[in-house]
């Protein structure tokens, strides 16, 4: 129980004024003081829900389904005091993502009746929970531009994308307000999980409200209006976008959506979310939005709106200043050489949805659907780095193995739990069997990296930034 939680009087007065009359303030405050239930989302790019359930049963993890996400679960573990959830082998291998249950709802809303996404934008994407959820929903097909304005958060976004085996993402690092002018009417699906005052995160962070003020709410609302206008300009006619926040006031939620109607009139339609999941109507507003107070579903506070663009809009004119794109599409000779060696050394192939691009000695696999956006803006990275060339061929990259390799690969080497711990600490390992050449390293039936046989040991190929210590699984 978070008895020392800080709830400003002005905040409570605001909630009292706007919360539906059938909800109780006493229950709201009591819910805010209860610790948040831990929740995860199974990464179906790496394993199915049924496969993960079997793993969980073997480890005596209790999984309770999240009603609005068929891959989401609240999790209870006996060993939670000794091994952190993020230090479990399953998490480190990308089999699941630690994600608050409410934050799974925006992507669920975006994917509903929207199975064939070709070009998507996640406008404010770090740390990557919704980006990886959307990529899994797209089955790594099409193209997903994941943008993050904060430079300090781009690194963790990149790390999570790689851990989860995402291959259809291009990362960008811009103020989201540029997209409407730079890429007008480009995306068929857009997620704007907007920066907000964070009123719904109290259960996770008891100090979340210490910097809150009515003035700060108004100030951040100005940014949100700019972002939602930019997103709407970037959306194709007929496309859908989801606007979401983890806050509770109307200024940052309903009012932002209504501002879009003020700006664009009949081009805007709000799509009702009352049938998104069982009992969704408990959080439904008159417009069809979901306004989730923490006591309704025993979760974080959240807001979700689904918006369809009915007709074209006139985007702002901008002048782009872009340097020369540093990559060149690989020619047929290069493609054959790379594909042949990849197959001969690791029995792997390039996904059909990706194509090879080369920059100096680097070989990258870009999503094919990104080709129309090459040269339209600058990218932090696109797709995944497959290899680096050297005098004896190609040096395959860890992130490529995490994206395309499976544990049943003929070249794989399965480690014991002791060896797997050594591996994650950056040390070479000595399995009982002996092989030769490069090998895909696995533990408990999941890919964890790439190594190379040197005598009777496997030389560790884990990137330095992924080396861990402490109490691992």
Swiss-Prot record:
Specifically methylates the cytosine at position 1407 (m5C1407) of 16S rRNA. It catalyses: cytidine(1407) in 16S rRNA + S-adenosyl-L-methionine = 5-methylcytidine(1407) in 16S rRNA + S-adenosyl-L-homocysteine + H(+). InterPro entries: Methyltr_RsmF_N (IPR031341), MeTrfase_RsmB-F_NOP2_cat (IPR049560), MeTrfase_RsmB-F_NOP2_dom (IPR001678), Nol1_Nop2_Fmu_2 (IPR027391), Nop2p (IPR011023), RCMT (IPR023267), rRNA_ssu_MeTfrase_F (IPR023545), SAM-dependent_MTases_sf (IPR029063). SUPFAM superfamilies: S-adenosyl-L-methionine-dependent methyltransferases. Belongs to the class I-like SAM-binding methyltransferase superfamily. RsmB/NOP family. One of its GO terms (cellular component) is cytoplasm. Its main location: cytoplasm. Keywords: Cytoplasm, Methyltransferase, RNA-binding, rRNA processing, S-adenosyl-L-methionine, Transferase. The active site is at 246 (nucleophile). The keyword Transmembrane helix does not apply. The keyword Methyltransferase applies. This is Ribosomal RNA small subunit methyltransferase F. It is found in: Cytoplasm. It is an enzyme of class 2 (transferase). Coiled coil: none annotated. CDD domains: AdoMet_MTases (cd02440). One of its GO terms (biological process) is rRNA base methylation. It comes from Aliivibrio salmonicida (strain LFI1238) (Vibrio salmonicida (strain LFI1238)). GO terms for molecular function: RNA binding; rRNA (cytosine-C5-)-methyltransferase activity. Pfam families: Methyltr_RsmB-F (PF01189), Methyltr_RsmF_N (PF17125), Methyltranf_PUA (PF13636), YebU_pre-PUA_dom (PF21150).
């Amino acid at each position: 129980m978070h008895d020392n939680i800080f709830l400003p009087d002005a905040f409570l007065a605001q909630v009292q004024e706007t919360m539906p009359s059938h909800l109780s303030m006493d229950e709201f405050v009591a819910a805010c003081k209860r610790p948040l239930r831990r929740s995860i989302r199974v990464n179906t790019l790496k394993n199915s829900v049924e496969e993960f359930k079997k793993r969980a049963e073997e480890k005596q993890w209790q999984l309770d389904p999240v009603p609005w996400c068929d891959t989401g679960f609240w999790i209870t573990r006996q060993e939670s005091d000794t091994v952190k959830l993020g230090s479990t082998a399953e998490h480190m291998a990308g089999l699941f993502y630690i994600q608050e249950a409410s934050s799974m709802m925006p992507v669920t809303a975006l994917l509903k009746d929207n199975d064939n996404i070709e070009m998507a934008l996640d406008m404010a994407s770090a740390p990557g929970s919704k980006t990886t959820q959307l990529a899994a929903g797209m089955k790594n097909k099409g193209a997903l531009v994941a943008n993050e304005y904060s430079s300090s958060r781009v690194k963790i976004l990149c790390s999570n994308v790689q851990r989860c085996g995402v291959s259809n993402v291009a990362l960008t690092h811009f103020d989201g307000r540029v997209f409407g002018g730079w890429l007008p009417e480009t995306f068929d699906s857009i997620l704007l999980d907007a920066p907000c005052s964070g009123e719904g995160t109290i259960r996770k962070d008891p100090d979340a409200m210490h910097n809150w003020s009515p003035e700060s709410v108004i100030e951040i609302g100005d940014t949100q209006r700019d972002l939602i206008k930019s997103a709407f300009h970037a959306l194709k006619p007929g496309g859908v976008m989801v606007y979401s926040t983890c806050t509770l006031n109307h200024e940052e939620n309903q009012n932002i959506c209504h501002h879009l109607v003020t700006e664009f009139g009949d081009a805007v339609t709000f799509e009702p979310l009352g049938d998104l999941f069982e009992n969704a109507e408990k959080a439904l507003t008159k417009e069809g939005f979901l306004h989730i107070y923490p006591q309704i579903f025993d979760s974080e506070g959240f807001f979700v709106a689904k918006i369809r663009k009915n007709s074209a809009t006139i985007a702002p004119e901008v002048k782009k200043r872009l340097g020369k794109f540093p990559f060149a599409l690989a020619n047929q000779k290069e493609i054959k050489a790379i594909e042949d060696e990849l197959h001969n050394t690791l029995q792997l192939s390039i996904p059909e949805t990706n194509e090879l691009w080369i920059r100096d000695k680097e070989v990258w696999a870009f999503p094919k659907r990104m080709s129309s956006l090459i040269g339209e803006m600058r990218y932090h990275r696109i797709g995944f780095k497959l290899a680096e060339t050297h005098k004896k061929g190609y040096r395959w990259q860890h992130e490529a193995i995490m994206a395309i390799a499976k544990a049943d690969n003929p070249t794989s080497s399965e480690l014991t739990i002791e060896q797997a711990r050594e591996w994650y600490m950056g040390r070479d390992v000595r399995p009982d069997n002996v092989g030769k050449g490069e090998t895909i390293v696995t533990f408990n039936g999941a890919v964890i990296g790439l190594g190379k046989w040197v005598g009777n040991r496997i030389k560790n190929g884990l990137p330095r930034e992924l080396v861990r210590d402490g109490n691992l699984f």
